[in-house]
From Swiss-Prot:
Source organism of this protein record: Photobacterium profundum (strain SS9)
GO CC, one annotated term: ribonuclease P complex
Summary of subunit composition and partner proteins: Consists of a catalytic RNA component (M1 or rnpB) and a protein subunit.
Family that this chain belongs to: Belongs to the RnpA family.
GO terms, molecular function: 3'-tRNA processing endoribonuclease activity; ribonuclease P activity; tRNA binding
Protein name according to UniProt: Ribonuclease P protein component
Gene3D superfamilies: 3.30.230.10
Function text: RNaseP catalyzes the removal of the 5'-leader sequence from pre-tRNA to produce the mature 5'-terminus. It can also cleave other RNA substrates such as 4.5S RNA. The protein component plays an auxiliary but essential role in vivo by binding to the 5'-leader sequence and broadening the substrate specificity of the ribozyme.
Keyword ATP-binding: no
Keyword list, A-Z: Endonuclease, Hydrolase, Nuclease, RNA-binding, tRNA processing
Origin: domain of life: Bacteria
UniProt-listed Enzyme Commission number(s): 3.1.26.5
Length: 118
């Protein structure tokens, strides 16, 4: 059975990791969020989050968005290619319900998986 934890090794931790993803990335986006993906040298995907105050004003709103994205990633990690992903929130992301956000993330994860596999 696959382990579904979201451990430290599945996170982008340093500014250098983020910088690499921003420099050369595949993009999948919607009006509510953008996901950038770049292949890594590891055998597992990693996740980074960019949720600016300018886009989602309240701390509880930003935390809620991040929690949902992390949970979606945690559940999909074994289906995703070995890429570094950065999820960037847009203003309208805070208007989505949990279910809508999960569906949108599933669609974007799937699109990026197809892109990276060729």
């Amino acid at each position: 059975m696959n382990k579904l934890a979201f451990s430290r090794e599945l996170r982008l931790l340093t500014p250098e990791h983020y910088k690499k993803v921003f420099q050369q990335a595949h993009r999948a986006g919607s009006p509510h969020l953008t996901i950038l993906a770049r292949p890594n040298d590891l055998n597992h995907p990693r996740l980074g989050l960019a949720v600016p105050k300018k886009q989602i004003k309240t701390a509880p709103g930003r935390n809620h968005f991040k929690r949902i994205v992390r949970e979606s990633f945690r559940l999909k990690q074994h289906d995703l290619p070995a890429n570094d992903f950065v999820v960037i929130a847009k203003k309208s992301a805070s208007e989505l319900s949990n279910e809508e956000l999960f569906k949108l993330l599933d669609k974007l994860w799937h699109r990026l998986s197809r892109l990276s596999r060729g």
